[in-house]
Amino acid sequence: IAWSNDDMPELGGDTTLEQCLSEASQAGFIGIESGGKFPKKSEELIPKLNEFNLNLCSGWYGANLRTNSVNEEKNLIQDQLKLFKDCNSPCMVFAEVSGSIQGDPNRKLSTRPQMDLEESKKYYEKISEMGKYLEDEGMPLAYHHHMGTVIETEEDTVRLLENTDDSVKLTLDTGHMLFAQGDSLKILKDFSERLIHMHC
């Protein structure tokens, strides 16, 4: 994300993957998240990462569990799951994008999707089942609260963690939490055992 942005491709759109990996390595990073410019096949991605002495530390998966069944989502995640397992990624950054305003500059943040109590309960059951599945696959689900999505605020994030199985872990994004006027330190204190990945 420091070199190019999948939500806004015009940010760093002309930055090559090689420049991104080279500069990340030179800066002292030993791991990097996948992005839109990264190869989607392990036989292509692994040599590219090795060339710059980098490991795959995670990457974004945009889910549609609000509209898909768990089995449908399991089928859709298979290619990325295989890629991440082949690359020995420690987790998968997982976010709900159904109805999200991402990629649509004409939509206001205030129009983001929201769930009523009935839908929330069903969603927590689905995400718990998905968390257990990915845990069994050795690829923990690290849920990313994100601006413009159904899980955006501190309240959304707390409610998600309080109502889902412990297999649903957390990607704490301090920038998104600040933007949503939430308290990252409180999340860290209250849910430290669920936190496995961070964006700062």
Roles of regions detected by a PLM:
Residues I1-P90, E129, E135-M139, D166-K169:
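N-terminal pre-domain/capping segments
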Residues W3-D6, A95-S100, C200:
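Short, solvent-exposed beta-strand-terminating loops
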Residues G35-K40, G148-T149, G175-L178, G182-D183:
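Short beta->alpha connector loops
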Residues K40-E44, E155, S184:
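Alpha-helical scaffolding within the catalytic cores
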Residues I46-N53, V158-D165, L188-S192:
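Short, surface-exposed basic-aromatic patches at helix termini and helix-loop junctions that form
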Residues D183-C200:
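Aromatic-lined glycan-binding groove of carbohydrate-active enzymes
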